[in-house]
């Protein structure tokens, strides 16, 4: 496996499709073993010292039955140690629950492959591939601004949902990702709660720095997140931002032509992505610029425009969110550099970090609350470049 001149491993040489197929084989093997579990247990318990079926079963080191043991992958959890509790969030393809794993508070992302007839075979294959890719990316990451990955399971028995009437067994085709539980919830929800009163400038810069450091780390690991938005950022109890949801992340190709396709969320997507052009990690930098504006303003970009209007305006008219006049010039400069239409003119995330660190937050500069905005033209219904 060769590296490009910039040290980035080519995605086409890593072959994520092969990785997904490899994980699929592990899943198939696990399901086969599950089906044969009863037969294996009967075979092992029937073997006894002296050849009598009624004798004590053969043991090793006094520890248990002789039999086949499935060797777990390094990222696989033990389903028997997982308790799934209340729902935290619901999405198109699954739910996020609060839970306990091996005595630790966790968040559990559940995906149902949909073998019950609700989805087509192609959709199921796509979901499995997304799940495998997310696990492959996430389990190797270790940074204070990235949500800690604990483990996952791709279709296993033993999962139980705790209800008021007692434990409820989950279907065997349910797959899950287990990560640390972050009580602060999504950054987006935090911003919505502060939409009227806004955030102090010190908090704005702290949140932005957390996100910038997390993205800088991902890029140092040759990972492009591709869906950077405040909804995918979580807060711990100390209000530290941690990046989550690696469902569309992938290893960056040294050749941008190897990375194409409209991936991301409207309002945060870079022009080159919206236009279907090749892109690289700089698409994350663009999305960070939009997030930075959102953190400062506690508002949504382009709330009154449709998908087609945003796509056309961002690509053809250089549409960007209005920067309030009360925004300190140093922070506004970071926004403008990050969302530059030319990816080559955007800074690297490891450059953005010191830019934010150098901003003086001791003299205020936060967004003016809604009831004090007479002297600050903070928003217009029609946003321009």
From Swiss-Prot:
Reaction catalyzed: L-seryl-[protein] + ATP = O-phospho-L-seryl-[protein] + ADP + H(+); L-threonyl-[protein] + ATP = O-phospho-L-threonyl-[protein] + ADP + H(+)
InterPro entries: Kinase-like_dom_sf, Prot_kinase_dom, Ser-Thr/Tyr_kinase_cat_dom, Ser/Thr_kinase_AS, Ser/Thr_Kinases-Pseudokinases
Active site (record annotation): 227
Domain Protein kinase: 82-356
Residue numbers binding ATP: 88-96, 109
Gene inactivation effect: Partial impairment in temperature decrease and slightly impaired stomatal opening triggered by blue light (BL). The double mutant cbc1 cbc2 exhibits a reduced voltage-dependent inward-rectifying K(+) current and suppressed low CO(2), red and blue light-induced stomatal opening leading to a severely impaired temperature decrease. Larger stomatal opening under both dark and blue light conditions in cbc1 cbc2 plants, and associated with increased phosphorylation of C-terminal Thr in plasma membrane-type ATPases (AHA1 and AHA2) in guard cells. Altered CO(2)-triggered stomatal closure.
GO biological process: cellular response to carbon dioxide; regulation of stomatal opening; response to blue light; response to red light; temperature homeostasis
Top-level taxon of origin: Eukaryota
Enzyme nomenclature, EC number: 2.7.11.1
Name of the featured protein: Serine/threonine-protein kinase 52
């Amino acid at each position: 496996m060769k590296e490009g001149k910039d040290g980035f491993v080519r995605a086409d040489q890593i072959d994520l499709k092969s990785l997904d197929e490899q994980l699929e084989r592990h899943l198939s093997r696990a399901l086969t073993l599950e089906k044969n579990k009863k037969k294996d247990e009967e075979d092992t318990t029937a073997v006894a010292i002296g050849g009598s079926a009624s004798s004590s079963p053969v043991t090793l080191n006094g520890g248990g039955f002789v039999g086949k043991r499935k060797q777990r992958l390094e990222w696989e959890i033990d389903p028997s140690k997982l308790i799934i509790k209340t729902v935290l969030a619901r999405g198109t393809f699954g739910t996020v629950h609060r839970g306990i794993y091996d005595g630790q508070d966790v968040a559990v992302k559940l995906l149902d492959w949909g073998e019950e007839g609700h989805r087509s075979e192609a959709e199921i294959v796509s979901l499995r591939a997304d799940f495998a890719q997310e696990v492959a990316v996430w389990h190797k990451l270790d940074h204070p601004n990235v949500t800690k990955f604990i483990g996952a399971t791709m279709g296993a028995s033993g999962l139980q949902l705790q209800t008021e009437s007692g434990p409820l067994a989950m279907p065997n085709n349910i797959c899950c990702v287990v990560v640390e539980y972050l009580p602060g919830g999504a950054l987006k929800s935090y911003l919505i709660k502060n939409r009227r009163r806004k955030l102090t400038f010190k908090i704005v810069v702290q949140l932005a720095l957390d996100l910038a450091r997390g993205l800088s780390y991902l890029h140092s690991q040759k990972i492009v997140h591709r869906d950077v938005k405040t909804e995918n950022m979580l807060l711990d109890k100390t209000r530290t931002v941690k990046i989550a949801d690696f469902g569309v992340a992938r290893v960056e190709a040294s050749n941008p032509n190897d990375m194409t396709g409209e991936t991301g969320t409207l309002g945060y997507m870079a022009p080159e992505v919206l236009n279907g052009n090749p892109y690289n990690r700089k698409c994350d930098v663009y999305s960070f610029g939009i997030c930075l504006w959102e953190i400062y303003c506690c508002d949504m970009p382009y709330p009154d425009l449709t998908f087609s209007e945003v796509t056309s305006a961002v690509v053809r008219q250089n549409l960007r969110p209005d920067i309030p006049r009360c925004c300190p010039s140093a922070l506004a400069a970071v926004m403008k550099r990050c969302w530059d239409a030319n990816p080559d003119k955007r800074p690297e995330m490891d450059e953005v970090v010191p830019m934010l660190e150098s901003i003086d937050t001791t003299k205020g500069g936060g967004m003016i609350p809604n009831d004090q905005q007479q002297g600050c033209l903070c928003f217009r219904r029609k946003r321009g470049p």
